[in-house]
Amino acid sequence: MMRKKLVILSMALLLAGGSIVAADKLMQKVTLLYNNKQSSEDGLLVDDKVYINIRSLSDSLQAFIQWKGSEKKLVIQKPNVHMFMMNEKRTMFGQVEKGSVQKFLVQAQIDNLNVAITEFKVTLTDPNDKEITIDRRSQADDDFKEFVEKDTFWFSSKLVSYDFKYAGRYKLRFWMEQKNAEPQLISEKIITAK
């Protein structure tokens, strides 16, 4: 009786091991790079098709991604946001000297805004990942409706003074937020301090 149980257990383990090997050959991990940056999640290769978690790409794509389960529909909304920085003399710039204090504002042109948003903001992140908010608008602001009731609008931030004390890449980012959702990165520009 004991021998019979041992044979059955050995066969079960052998079959399980074979199934794992077969499954490993059917589904292989795929490393995903977007603009030479590795995604936080790997994809899977199944029958020569790559499957990825699209939500993990929302910041890379700089888009709103929404899964509507009841409709079996994936919706990707990508507003166009073009930003540039202007000094107090209204001259555009994208490079600064390390250690310089700059007074500037951010100009943003937004179009193809086909989703309702409750807030937007502009941030600047230094090479050490310390982020400051340059300007923001939300539904509580009197002028918010003039920006977001159209699918196209222009935005000028307030004039700010900022110390570019570190050498490296500073990230100028434009975020939008939908109702009951986290802020979503929509656009990013790089300012280099040398």
Language model features: what each stretch is:
Residues 1-194:
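Primary recognition of N-terminal secretory signal peptides and signal-anchoring hydrophobic helices
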